[in-house]
Design a protein with these regions (language model features):
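Conserved activation segment of eukaryotic-like protein kinases, specifically the C-terminal portion
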Residues: 233-247
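Protein kinase glycine-rich loop
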Residues: 49-56, 60
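Activation-segment/catalytic-loop signature of the eukaryotic protein kinase fold
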Residues: 119
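Conserved short submotifs of the Hanks-type protein kinase catalytic core
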Residues: 123-137, 141, 145
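Catalytic-loop of the protein kinase fold
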Residues: 196-212
Length: 292
């Protein structure tokens, strides 16, 4: 990690008539101590708010991170559940893997990837601090009840515009217009490319793991299933309807596996129905994916 350091040739100065007095020596000395100390530490407080979601890995809360002088910042906290692990050591090993991958993802700084801010523990339960995204996950945007609620709230002319340009009812859920769907996929591809360049696989690309912000931009979230190519465990979790055939069969994963999952999301957005709806048997699901 490297950052260019430079000396500002035009420093910010007080406006005319503002300040100008001498800083107290004691305050200036404390400033110097902070700069020269080599280490900083402080206590952070989070007020848990509403649940944003839950799944096999745990629960995500919207929280408020409190600083000093009245500073507050909305962030998301994911509390990782130990339920699926048969021992504390198994839970700890899995959390260490997630922490390592999360640290790598945090350094990528790609606009379409979730920003991971910290990974901590409370009573040996691991917690990931992430940016809070002001928007909806794609599965919610495709839900038919949301489209109906929108229809009830907008004017007839606005509804006509939405149907012509953005979204229409589909067979089982809402269907996005091709231009909108492609824009979402394009931004997800940028996020996946950033992961793949550093040999990380997301491992669970699906509509509920894609957030669409109120600005219209898409972000891939939930890196709890992400692994590095070099250290991928032999047994991994997946969402069967969105998993590539090789993932379902327990064979080696690759960047192509993530791309296949994103392809199923594209089919879902354009068709107006969940991918491979109605298929319950493992073999039927595999055959349907191979023939798509």
């Amino acid at each position: 990690m490297s950052t260019t350091i430079f000396q500002d040739g035009q420093p910010t100065l007080p406006a005319a008539g503002v300040g100008g007095g001498r800083c107290p020596d004691a305050l200036l000395a404390r400033y110097g101590q902070v700069l020269d100390g080599g280490r900083l530490n402080w206590t952070q407080y989070h007020n848990l708010g509403r649940r944003l979601g839950s799944g096999g890995q745990g629960v995500v809360f919207l929280t408020t991170r409190k600083g000093t002088d009245g500073f507050t910042l909305p962030v998301a906290l994911k509390v990782f559940s130990p339920e699926r692990y048969d021992s504390e050591s198994a839970y700890s090993a899995a959390m260490e893997r997630i922490a390592r991958v999360s640290a790598q993802v945090a350094q990528i700084q790609q606009d379409n990837l979730l920003d991971v801010q910290n990974f901590v523990e409370q009573r040996q339960i691991r917690i990931m601090e992430m940016e809070w995204i002001d928007g909806y996950d794609l599965s919610r945007l495709l839900a038919p009840d949301l489209l109906e609620q929108t229809r009830e709230r907008v004017s007839a002319s606005r509804w006509e515009y939405l149907n012509n340009v953005i979204v229409t009812p589909g067979p089982r859920q809402s269907r996005l217009k091709p231009g909108v769907a492609i824009a979402i996929v394009r931004e997800c591809l940028a996020a996946l490319a950033a992961l793949h360049r550093v040999n990380i696989l997301h491992g669970d690309v699906k509509s509920s793991n894609i957030m669409v912000k109120r600005t219209g931009n898409a972000k891939i979230i939930d890196i709890g299933s992400a692994v590095t190519l070099a250290t991928a465990p032999s047994h991994r979790t997946c969402t069967p309807a969105y998993a590539a055939p090789e993932v379902l069969e327990g064979r080696d994963h690759s960047p192509s596996s993530d791309l296949a999952s994103l392809g199923y999301v594209l089919v879902e957005m354009l068709s107006g129905q969940p991918p491979f709806a109605g298929l319950t048997s493992f073999q039927d699901l595999l055959e349907a994916k191979r023939s798509l």
